[in-house]
Amino acid sequence: MVDVAESRRTQRAEGPRTIFAIATANPPNCVEQSTYPDFYFKITNSEHKVELKEKFQRMDDKSMIKRRYMYLTEEILKENPNVCEYMAPSLDARQDMFVVEVPRLGKEAAVKAIKEWGQPKSKITHLIVCTTSGVDMPGADYQLTKLLGLRPHVKRYMMYQQGCFAGGTVLRLAKDLAENNKGARVLVVCSEVTAVTFRGPSDTHLDSLVGQALFGDGAAALIVGSDPIPEIEKPLFELIWTAQTIAPDSEGAIDGHLREVGLTFHLLKDVPGIVSKNIDKALVEAFQPLGISDYNSIFWIAHPGGPAILDQVEQKLAFKPEKMRATREVLSEYGNMSSACVLFILDEMRKKSAQNGLKTTGEGLEWGVLFGFGPGLTIETVVLLRSVAI
């Protein structure tokens, strides 16, 4: 007779849930923020909107972004004039781009992550793919399975239309899969392209213009599992605890809708205030059981929705100037890449920690936190990624 309790127990991993590899990828087209307003208003035939262009220039100047990477080149946009108009029917053209570029960019990051991991891809048991850039069937998870040559029976999870908080969501799901499936090795891929949100400017919808100043394209990939193989798998961060919550009284703060005109985004001005007002509660829930109340003593990875959010969080928690260094660096060099952003920040942090000779992947600190913020307003907390010695 089979012992059901024992059967359940043997299916669970015993060791810590660990990130073994991180890699990123971007399209080759690099856009300098300082000259982007000229390009944007020219390509959208909006140069006559002088005052609006001046507003957009100020947005770009305040964004704290130096450059972004975008799949959409001048040539592609000229071939698709409806994509350049404000609210012109264009979903078919956008979808044609999305179904190719999201898996392609995701593959580029995944190949790098698998190489760093150092194990054959046949050992990947689960695949999580996340994108806010569109929907299709079979999904980007299926396309990636084919592009990477993964086993046909790999267990796939496709997450569409989640938004900027989803970098935390994929880690939460990967943690649960790794700890409840002994021997699991989870490939996580977030791939985002702005082809679905790009459109010309409007005098009456400045929140749309904010998105045009912030969003960039990028993909990030991770390998997650439990019980590292000694001398072969190298732990980078441990996933300790996760949570998701909806901020009270935040309905409509951030939302997006897939329409015939593409994906439209709407933001309330008080998004930074909502985030900063609710972050204390999330931190207490996460760190009180660990006896941690000094949030300057942990390393920070926060989704860089924009500089105003980071400024208010820093002020609210009385942060030291360098506390958000990795987050601000990624915002500066890549812009807001939605779900992929926090994974880029993880990569930036562990690389700089090694370059600076620090004792852990988390800027020399033992404990840390990862936050994702997005539509809902939804807050994802990953408590946090405990760093291990380099």
Swiss-Prot record:
<dbReference type="Pfam" id="PF02797">
    <property type="entry name" value="Chal_sti_synt_C"/>
</dbReference>
<dbReference type="GO" id="GO:0030639">
    <property type="term" value="P:polyketide biosynthetic process"/>
</dbReference>
<dbReference type="InterPro" id="IPR012328">
    <property type="entry name" value="Chalcone/stilbene_synt_C"/>
</dbReference>
<keyword id="KW-0012">Acyltransferase</keyword>
<comment type="function">
    <text>The primary product of this enzyme is 4,2',4',6'-tetrahydroxychalcone (also termed naringenin-chalcone or chalcone) which can under specific conditions spontaneously isomerize into naringenin.</text>
</comment>
<dbReference type="InterPro" id="IPR018088">
    <property type="entry name" value="Chalcone/stilbene_synthase_AS"/>
</dbReference>
<keyword id="KW-0284">Flavonoid biosynthesis</keyword>
<dbReference type="InterPro" id="IPR011141">
    <property type="entry name" value="Polyketide_synthase_type-III"/>
</dbReference>
<comment type="pathway">
    <text>Secondary metabolite biosynthesis; flavonoid biosynthesis.</text>
</comment>
<protein>
    <recommendedName>
        <fullName>Chalcone synthase</fullName>
        <ecNumber>2.3.1.74</ecNumber>
    </recommendedName>
</protein>
<dbReference type="GO" id="GO:0016210">
    <property type="term" value="F:naringenin-chalcone synthase activity"/>
</dbReference>
<comment type="similarity">
    <text>Belongs to the thiolase-like superfamily. Chalcone/stilbene synthases family.</text>
</comment>
<dbReference type="InterPro" id="IPR001099">
    <property type="entry name" value="Chalcone/stilbene_synt_N"/>
</dbReference>
<dbReference type="InterPro" id="IPR016039">
    <property type="entry name" value="Thiolase-like"/>
</dbReference>
<feature type="active site">
    <location>
        <position position="164"/>
    </location>
</feature>
<keyword id="KW-0808">Transferase</keyword>
<dbReference type="Pfam" id="PF00195">
    <property type="entry name" value="Chal_sti_synt_N"/>
</dbReference>
<dbReference type="GO" id="GO:0009813">
    <property type="term" value="P:flavonoid biosynthetic process"/>
</dbReference>
